[in-house]
Amino acid sequence: METEVEHTGLAIHPMDQFIVKKLFCHTESTAPMNECTTNIHWYDITNVTMWMAIAVLVIAAILVLGTRRRAIVPSRSQSVAELLYGFIHNMVEEVTGHEGVKYFPYVMTLFLFVLCGNVLGLLPLSFTTTSHMAVTVPLALMVFVGVTALGFMKNGPGFLKMFWVTSAPLAIRPVLAVIEVISYFVRPVSHSIRLAGNMMAGHAVIKVIAGFASIVVVSPVVVGAVTAIYALELLVAVVQAYVFTILTCVYLRDAVGDAHH
């Protein structure tokens, strides 16, 4: 059955692009699942680690090129660096207040890493690192654990007051407190799944539509559709990085601001 489908040009495997593979593997098998994709250990260098390293190098290049020759009349690289700096700095200050600005370096690093991971995944033959929960979950957990620790460090036991809705009638406050606690611990789940799900869905759709390009009759339509979706995915890549970052700022505000509702 698989052979017949392949001859029709419709053998589409949109999820193969998300398979984690070892970069150094001796097998010559072309099967989707072989020893290059199984028995992967923490010390193995995979396509995920390679593209995360590339993202870090891109971020470093942007910042180094944008700041090495600062001038009153900025160059293009300096303009890009200043635009990113001003955009994230204003976001942090507006959402978290003046007290949260001291955490701006972490927020900007997080934004640039997610943005580069999203955008690099649109390149041909690349790998979208932010489509994997193995990447987005640690990012979300770092935010969750860091914000929680910071909240207790700055407010002590008073940080728990954020779960007690004083504006609600006393009779329903215990129920609301349970809901608030549950929603708080669900934060890293929604924070990570939102990013990974959006990036995976968009790339899978592109792969499915591109699979029909072999049909000559509809190929012009397919090329146009893929181009349009690529443009949309570029927008989604930026928006998802923004959403991930602004949610981080919102969570940070709970820790550095007033814990009361």
UniProtKB/Swiss-Prot annotation:
GO CC aspect terms: plasma membrane; proton-transporting ATP synthase complex
Annotated transmembrane regions: 45-65, 107-127, 133-153, 162-182, 209-229, 232-252
Topology of the protein relative to the lipid bilayer: Multi-pass membrane protein
Protein name as annotated: ATP synthase subunit a
Similarity remark: Belongs to the ATPase A chain family.
Subcellular location: Cell inner membrane
UniProt xrefs under InterPro entries: ATP_synth_F0_asu, ATP_synth_F0_asu_AS, ATP_synth_F0_asu_bact/mt, F0_ATP_A_sf
Function: Key component of the proton channel; it plays a direct role in the translocation of protons across the membrane.
Pfam families to which the protein is assigned, alphabetical: ATP-synt_A (PF00119)
Principal location listed in the UniProt entry: membrane
NCBIfam families in the record: ATP_synt_6_or_A, PRK05815.2-4
Protein's organism: Cereibacter sphaeroides (strain ATCC 17023 / DSM 158 / JCM 6121 / CCUG 31486 / LMG 2827 / NBRC 12203 / NCIMB 8253 / ATH 2.4.1.) (Rhodobacter sphaeroides)
